[in-house]
Amino acid sequence: MPDKLRRDPKVLELVREFAEAEKLVAAICHGGWIAISAGVYRGVRVTGSLGIKDDLVNAGAIWEDAPVVVDRHFVSSRKPADLPDFCRGILSAMAGVRE
């Protein structure tokens, strides 16, 4: 699914608009591909599926191997097994995200 979404210009524009407005942008597993294609991860601390680690690094992201990484309004997680941490990270980020 992320592979299809990352090719949709409307999806990419939405992600860019959220990132620029400092609204929550969250991705788990291969979902980081969408943010990569939107060009919003440069200089952002992230995690994701080990299979996209090189893609994240090549896009300018700062890779961390952790269940969840929260960097301002960006939340990322590695895999479905990390879902509890991912949900806590989203709640944490939402507490600090401007409307």
Indicate where each model-derived feature is located.
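Active-site-adjacent pocket-lining segments in enzyme domains
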Residues: 1-99
